[in-house]
């Protein structure tokens, strides 16, 4: 059995296959998944799993070079942003895009992870780094 916190097979597979510059999106329950992009649906009920728990589990395995957030997040300040601030040392450089442009960016993601999070704009694009 794996020793790291991340147990989801599909999510572990995607992370293991990511290379430098690849994108993984973690989204709230309402974020649309573009056609042709793999969706890893973790949502069970509203709020379960929450965005923060999924982000922490992903960061246990993924080396992140930078991350992208929607500008609208700064106005709404969902709990996800509080967790992102807490984890900023593991997230690399930050970039801001409009929510519409964030959705355009998600078209080039290796996968979109759908959480049960129901707070608006609780989405992040993680751009993979290297460990060497």
UniProtKB/Swiss-Prot annotation:
Task: Report the EC code(s) recorded for this entry.
Answer: 5.4.99.62
Listed GO MF terms? D-ribose pyranase activity; intramolecular lyase activity; monosaccharide binding
| Major subcellular site | cytoplasm
Single GO BP term: D-ribose catabolic process
Keyword Isomerase attributed: yes
Q: Can you list the GO cellular component terms from the UniProt entry?
A: cytosol
Give the active-site positions: 20 (proton donor)
Q: Kindly list the places in or outside the cell where this protein is found, as annotated in its UniProt entry.
A: Cytoplasm
Record pathway = Carbohydrate metabolism; D-ribose degradation; D-ribose 5-phosphate from beta-D-ribopyranose: step 1/2
Q: For this UniProt record, give its keywords in alphabetical order, as a comma-separated list.
A: Carbohydrate metabolism, Cytoplasm, Isomerase
Q: Does the keyword Transcription apply?
A: no
The disulfides recorded in the entry are none
| Reaction(s) the record says it catalyses | beta-D-ribopyranose = beta-D-ribofuranose
Which residues of the sequence carry a binding annotation for substrate? Answer: 28, 99, 121-123
Q: Broadest EC class? A: isomerase
**NCBIfam families assigned to the protein according to its UniProt record, in alphabetical order:** PRK11797.1
Subunit structure of this entry? Homodecamer.
Q: Which family does it belong to?
A: Belongs to the RbsD / FucU family. RbsD subfamily.
**What is the role of the protein in this entry?**
Catalyzes the interconversion of beta-pyran and beta-furan forms of D-ribose.
Q: What is this protein called?
A: D-ribose pyranase
User: What organism does the UniProt record list as the source?
Assistant: Pseudomonas putida (strain GB-1)
């Amino acid at each position: 059995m794996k020793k790291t916190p991340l147990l989801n097979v599909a999510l572990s597979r995607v992370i293991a296959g990511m290379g430098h510059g690849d994108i993984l999106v973690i989204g709230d329950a309402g974020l649309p998944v573009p056609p042709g992009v793999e969706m890893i649906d973790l949502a069970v009920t509203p709020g379960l799993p929450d965005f923060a728990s999924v982000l922490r589990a992903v960061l246990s395995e993924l080396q992140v070079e930078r991350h992208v957030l929607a500008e609208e997040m700064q106005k709404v300040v969902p709990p996800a942003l509080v967790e992102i601030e807490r984890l900023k040392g593991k997230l690399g450089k930050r970039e801001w895009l409009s929510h519409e442009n964030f959705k355009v960016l998600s078209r080039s993601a290796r996968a979109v992870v759908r959480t049960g999070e129901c707070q608006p704009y609780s989405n992040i694009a993680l751009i993979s780094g290297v460990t060497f």
